[in-house]
Amino acid sequence: LHQHGVIHRDITPANIILARDGAHLIDFGIARIWSASSNRSRDTTALGTYGFASPEQYGFAKTDARSDVFSLGRLLGFMLTGVYPDASDYEQRLADDAAVPARLRAVIGYACAFEPSKRPQSVQEFRQALFSQSNPPMPNASSANPPSTRTTNGSASASRLFRRLHLSKRAIVLWSIAGAALIIAA
């Protein structure tokens, strides 16, 4: 998508469908064409789904691939917690070591840094941080989702996690496959 100059600007669970050949991103209604040589200094309309849209989408700043990286970070947080990012208990669930291992929380914090320059600069860089064995760079205090300072002694068992999220195993697997497919396909 980005290699073709398209910025989606509305990556949410509702805009992902699963098909036999994998996960697909749909609803390009607010997508825009972007290029490095574009003379557009800012977007003029606040668009995107609240909770998933990047801060620059609401601050009338220029959006680019890093805006979609922010949304992917929020999508990952949703997949791990089962709670939408605009819910009152999202941050609490995200900070729960039993639900979200510290390393994944750090990846989410990195992707969701308030300043675009502090985020992965591309979906490929986000994918590398997600699948790397080392910890991603830690965002500074201006991140949208500061990672918890608590440590973890390992991730919870799958059955305990499913019970905590009140989601079926099928739903967890489908969301995980969809998210991973989108990240890998990018």
Locations of the language-model features?
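Conserved protein kinase catalytic/activation segment
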Residues: 15-26
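Conserved activation segment of eukaryotic-like protein kinases, specifically the C-terminal portion
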Residues: 41-56
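Conserved C-terminal C-lobe helix
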Residues: 99-114
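Conserved HRD-motif arginine in the catalytic loop of eukaryotic-like protein kinases
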Residues: 119
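Conserved catalytic-loop aspartate of Hanks-type protein kinases
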Residues: 68
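Protein kinase catalytic-loop region centered on the HRD/HxD motif
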Residues: 1-6
